[in-house]
Amino acid sequence: MTSDQETRVLAMLSAFEAGKKISELDTASGSVSDMRIEVLDTDGESKVMNLSEAVTTAANAVCGRYWNESNSTYRAAGYHGSLDMLRKLPELLGLGCYLVQDDRTRRKLDPTNHYRFEDGTPAKLDGTMGQYMWCWNIGFYFAEWKVGNLKYYAVSLSPIKGKQCVYIPAGGLSALGGGVMDRTNNILCSVVSDAAQYRGGNNDASRDGTYRTQLGMVATNMQYRNFSTYARKRGEGWDANWYVAQAVVEILFMIIFGTRNMQEAVIAEKDSNGLYQGGLGAGTTNMPNWDQWGYYPVVPTSAGIELGDGCGETTFNVLKEDGSLHYAAKVPVFFGLKHPFGHIWKIVRGLIDNVGDEKSEVYVAPSLYAGYDDNSISGLIKVCEVPRTSGYIKQKSYYLLCAMPTEIGATASTYFCDYFWENSASSKGLRVRLSGAGANDGTDAGAFATGTNNAASNSNANVSAPLCFFDADPVMSA
C-alpha cells in the first residue's frame, strides 16, 4: 500500500470512528423545507431529496408514466412516483364490472365470472338486477405536465402537489362498448339480452333469425344527441359516454400498460417490475365486406364476458349466411371493459368542436349535472384547438380531460398510433367527437382515435354511445 493510500484509509477510519448513531445526533433546529435526505433512486444510485417533498410524496402516493417526446416510440420511457401504487392501481381504483342501480348504488361482480356476484350469489346481466357497468369505484386526481422533452401522466387519491389537477369522481361506463336501447321504455341501458325489447342496430325486426340479426347487439343509427336524452332518463348522474368517462379509459390504459398503442399485441406476462405490458390486440377492426351487414354491429354484447375483469382478447366468429366463417373478430377487454376501441364508433358527449373558417376550437361542458346544449358553445370552456388536416395523432391534450388531438404527423406505429379524421375544408359548424373507430378501420383504430366530421344531429349504422354515470358531478373549471 502506498503512503497516499495509507493516508486515505486512515482518514476513512477516522471518519468512521467519529460517526454517531442516530440516537446520538443533535436535534435539528432548521426549517423542514430546507432539510435534505439521501434516497435510493430507481436507477440504484443514491440521490438527494428535499425532506418536506419526500414526506408529502409518501403520504400522498402518486403514480404514472412518462414519455420521452424527443423520440416517436409509443412505449413509455419509465414510470413516475410509487412503483408499488402503479402495480396495485387497478385494485386500488376497484377497476372491474359491477351491477349498478339507477340510484348509482352497485354490487361488485366476481372478477372471474360475471354471472355471479363477488360473494358467490347468482347475478343476471339482463337488466333485472341493474346495469352491467365497468367502473372505477373511487374518485381520483389526474395531472399531466412536461419537463423538457418528458411528458408525464399521473394519478393520485389526493391532489398532486405543484401540479394542475382535475378530480374524477367515482363512476362507470357500459361494459359492452356501446349503448343498448330498451325499445319499450325508450331508455339507454347496459344489458346482455337477446329479447326483442333490447334489439340493437336500428331495431330492424326483419333481420331476426338471420345471419345479420341485431338481437343482442348495441343500438346504433339514432341521432347522436338522443343517446344522452335516453340515458338521462335514469336520473341525476347518468349520461352517454360523457367526455370525462372517455378520458378515464385513455388515461388509465396509458398509465397501467405504459403504451399509447392499444392495438399492440397482447402479452400475458407482466414485466420485470411487475407492471402490465403490451396491448389488447387488433380488436374488431379488420371486418371484410362490412357493407353486406349494412355497417351495423356484428359482435353481440355477450362476447368477451368470459374474460371477467381480465385484460386481453377473445374471439367471436362472424358467420356468413350459409353458416361458414366470415371473420374471426377479436374482442379486446380492459379489466372487463369490452371494445374500448373498434367494432362500433362511440359518440363522446359534453364536448364540441367549433369548426370555423380559420380555426377548429374545442370546448367542454363545465358540469354534467347542469345539462348541456350541443347547439351552442355558450357557457362552455375552450380547452384546445385541433388540426385542420386529417392524419395519425402525434400529440393529444388532456387539459380538463378533453382528450383531443392537437398535432398530427405520426404513423400507425409511432406516438399515439391512432388516426384523426376531420373535414374542415368542406364543412363548418359545431361537431362532436367520435372515438375508437369501427370494425373496418384497421390500424387507424384505437381508443385515442378521433373523428370530428359530424354534428350531433347525425345518425349512423356504425355509431353508438355507451351508458355512463358518476357518483358526483365531474365539474371542470379553467
What residue spans do the PLM features occupy?
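Short aromatic-cysteine micro-motif
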Residues: 128-130, 157-339
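Extended, Lys/Arg-enriched charged tracts that mediate electrostatic binding to polyanionic substrates
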Residues: 95-158
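Intrinsically disordered, low-structural-confidence terminal and linker regions
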Residues: 58-79
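Short, surface-exposed terminal/edge motifs of secreted or surface/virion proteins that either
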Residues: 36-57
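A short, polar/charged loop-to-alpha-helix boundary motif
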Residues: 354-368
